[in-house]
Amino acid sequence: MICVVIMRHQAWQSDGLPLSSSSNEACKLYDAILSQYVTWRNDETLGGIEGCITSIKAADPDFVMGHVISTGLELVGTGSSVLRDERLASAVRRTVELADTQQLTSREKNHVKAVQLFSKGALHKACEVWECILADHPTDLLALKFAHDGFFYLGEQTQMRDSVARVMPHWKPHMPLYRQIKGMYSFGLLETRLYDEAEKMAKEALSLTPEDGWSVHAVAHVHEMKAEVEKGLNFMASTEKNWTVCDMLACHNYWHWALYHIEKGNYEAALKIFDEQVSQRCVKSGAMLDIVDSCSLLYRLELEGVSVGERYRELLQVTQPHSEDHTLLFNDLHFLMVSLGSKDTGTTQRLLESLQELAKDPAENRQLQIAERVGLPMCQALLEFEQRNYRQAVELLKPIKQSFVEIGGSDAQRDVFSQLLIHAAMKSGDKEHQQLARCMLMERDAVRPNSPLTDRLIQRAHSLHA
């Protein structure tokens, strides 16, 4: 059972974060939703996040921050798009309309503004607004977590780290969820390659809260990025009972566990985790993080020459409804892996054509603004690789390989695209491409020494190019 610290209306006011609602119940539920979001853990005694959202609307239907957190969470989840989901678009409009008719604090008004900007795809502008909130209210945890997620989607790794660093001195050990701030900062540290500092910070958090799934996740990343396979396997196994209680993150942590097995060449073990954990959790939750993890795991295995059977077709049932959402290019690329793996040319065509059409008039949408330069070439490269046009795949990816970060996600998640370029370059008949593959493998070996996967790829390159 999760320990949710329930704060009443007066407590929020005492902390300098007043909530414009006359309902103590609504304020308590707001706190419960925020706590579950930050801890990645649904509290079933409260009905989970969904149950709390239903209850908060009943307690105070006009509570603006209740609408901000419920609508904001759906937007940040990236599983729905206002372009295709009128219910979500209506929820955003309702939030703005309520704010226009009430006397709110400037902090609350800025929260509404940020949610509206995020709904338009203006993630960078939304993050600027959340940062403005944090400048005056450094303990506003909703602004901090939304900004953290926003910077993650933008690939703004330094900002993701520094956004937390700027507010940490204002957080004290007695404050609710203080421990989770350490985990957030740890993730920012590791995404800026400060691995030792990241591991130290995450383990400090875990010494206080062993079931902190996000800090477990940070340590898993450190071992992945340093190719510390045995350490990673032992760590995940020894802490499994702790982090599986974080139901919104457990699937992703199993994904990390499977990556160690792929790194080691234990493909059957990786498939076992996919079948018993990742796939089942993905279907059950429908959460976008779980979906892209499933896509990525199958694709990585195929790059290694592993047959995944009918798994792509089964996963297509989950990804297909999202093929024209276009909330994030990162998501689109993963959906494309599945439609290509399933040989579903219709879904592939719809995804590419609809993205091309939206990219013609991106407006404020940051993802669509970079689609033509980064996203669409990456999509086309996946298609060319699937059709064994390796030379074309390399020509598409090589000029933008330093721009992969702009699609968002973590270094570990985006590594699949670096692997794709290496495989395409190795298989290309072009001598310059083959040289590129060898150079990328040397780069990889320098920053991740003792990587079994890199060693295998180097051996493969030598045998192909001998």
Curated annotation (Swiss-Prot):
Keywords linked to the UniProt accession: Repeat, TPR repeat
TPR repeat placement: 175-212, 251-284, 368-400
Organism of origin: Danio rerio (Zebrafish)
Taxonomic lineage: Eukaryota, Metazoa, Chordata, Craniata, Vertebrata
Similarity remark: Belongs to the TTC38 family.
Presence of keyword Repeat: yes
Record-linked Gene3D superfamilies: Tetratricopeptide repeat domain
Family matches, as InterPro entries: TPR-like_helical_dom_sf, TTC38
Protein name: Tetratricopeptide repeat protein 38
Keyword Flavoprotein: no
Classification via SUPFAM superfamilies: TPR-like
Transmembrane segments annotated in the record for this chain: none
